[in-house]
């Protein structure tokens, strides 16, 4: 990944006399001296390639021709390295990020003030940050830093550069697309392993374990917490207990994904635990599958995610009426209450702006579903789409989803 080029593109979008600060984040404590696993701020990672705690990226733009960049790291501690592993060293940080100017976090505020007061002269600096981020560490640390600076110098302005970062991150380059393809390929293998080992009376978390094992073998992480829901549990959108056993004739809804080099895949497949769909299951599944294909045919530059979702609702209105599921009381939203798509990338629900049109290079999900709680049927079919010049490419097309293909595959192992 060309992190330097990404920083250059961001700097081109920023005002003169601006200082941009990004923070990598820090893992909070869960209980006692035990920490949650660290998850780097994805925008910090996007511009540096470094996945370490408590680092700062600082970009300074004085003019179109004059800018500089600095990375602030923690000093290496030999004693702590023996207990929890070493902090990143200057040479390693320089090699990964291509940032030559490596400094220590202890000098962060003083160094920024130096640029403001020595170089700003009569110009008022603008402090730029990704201030719409939901990560608590990012919002608290950078916002508080800016608050302190403005208190010390009220002439400073603050600019939220969430949109600029979104524009860059939403348009995936070829390297990013290939990494996402890899994540999807591993997800495919995991789903097929689940299908091959599915049987009635199997526990949901036992099926889930086959996916977990696949990820471990392929040196991948989970993109998000796996949903492995059987029967009525599949009508709960974000079901996560995964601790019930599957009865004969149950469907299994598995919403899961591998993460490779931090890039997520997000796939959902629904299959019969015993390898055979009932006629009613086939009827509902076919409607969802056709909705999935409708979105794939429609997705292209210029459309919004809301337009794709509205098309699915209109399609369901006609199809559900035809099979008697809609009346004066029941509406489509009684059977389908989520959106059909979200952005995908370094985050499973990747950085996005509501109503922003799709552009070439965006990767989105395509996940229509129907949930008939009274019948114990929950079906969702989710694929990952790459927006191209005039349409889209289904990156997950190799993962089977036709009824006949699923039954044929599963019954090889019965």
Spans of model-derived segments:
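Active-site neighborhoods and metal-handling regions in enzymes and metal-associated proteins
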Residues: 1-414
């Amino acid at each position: 990944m060309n992190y330097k080029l990404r920083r250059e593109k961001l700097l081109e979008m920023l005002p003169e006399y601006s200082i941009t600060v990004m923070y990598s984040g820090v893992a909070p404590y869960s209980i006692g001296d035990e920490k949650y696993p660290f998850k780097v701020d994805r925008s910090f990672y996007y511009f540096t390639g470094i996945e370490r705690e408590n680092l700062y990226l600082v970009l300074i733009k004085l003019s179109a021709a004059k800018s500089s960049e600095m990375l602030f790291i923690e000093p290496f501690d030999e004693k702590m390295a023996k207990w929890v592993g070493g902090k990143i060293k200057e040479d390693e940080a320089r090699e990964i990020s291509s940032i030559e100017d490596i400094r220590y976090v202890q000098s962060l505020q003083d160094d920024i003030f130096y640029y403001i007061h020595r170089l700003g002269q009569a110009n008022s600096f603008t402090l730029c940050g990704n201030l719409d981020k939901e990560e608590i560490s990012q919002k608290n640390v950078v916002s508080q830093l800016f608050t302190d600076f403005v208190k010390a110098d009220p002439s400073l302005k603050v600019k939220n550069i969430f949109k600029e970062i979104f524009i860059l991150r939403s348009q995936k380059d070829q390297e990013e697309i290939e990494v996402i393809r890899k994540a999807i390929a591993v997800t495919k293998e995991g789903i097929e392993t689940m299908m091959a080992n599915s049987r009635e009376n199997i526990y949901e978390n036992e099926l889930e374990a086959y996916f977990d094992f696949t990820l471990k073998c392929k040196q991948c992480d989970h993109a998000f917490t796996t949903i492995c829901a059987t029967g009525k549990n599949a009508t709960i959108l974000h079901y996560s207990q995964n601790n019930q056993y599957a009865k004969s004739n149950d469907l299994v809804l598995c919403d899961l994904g591998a993460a490779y080099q931090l890039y997520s895949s997000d796939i959902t497949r629904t299959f019969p635990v015993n390898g055979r769909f009932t006629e009613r299951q086939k009827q509902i599944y076919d409607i969802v599958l056709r909705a999935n294909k409708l979105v794939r045919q429609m997705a292209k530059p210029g459309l919004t995610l809301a337009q794709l979702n509205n098309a699915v609702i209109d399609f369901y209105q006609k199809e559900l009426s035809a099979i008697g599921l809609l009346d004066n009381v029941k509406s489509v939203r009684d059977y389908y209450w989520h959106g059909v798509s979200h952005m995908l990338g370094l985050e499973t629900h990747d950085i996005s702006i509501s109503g922003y049109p799709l552009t070439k290079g965006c990767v989105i999900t395509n996940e229509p579903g129907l949930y008939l709680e009274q019948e114990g049927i929950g079906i969702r079919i989710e694929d990952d789409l790459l927006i191209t010049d005039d349409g889209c490419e289904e990156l997950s097309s190799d993962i089977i989803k036709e009824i006949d293909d699923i039954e044929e595959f599963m019954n090889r192992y019965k």
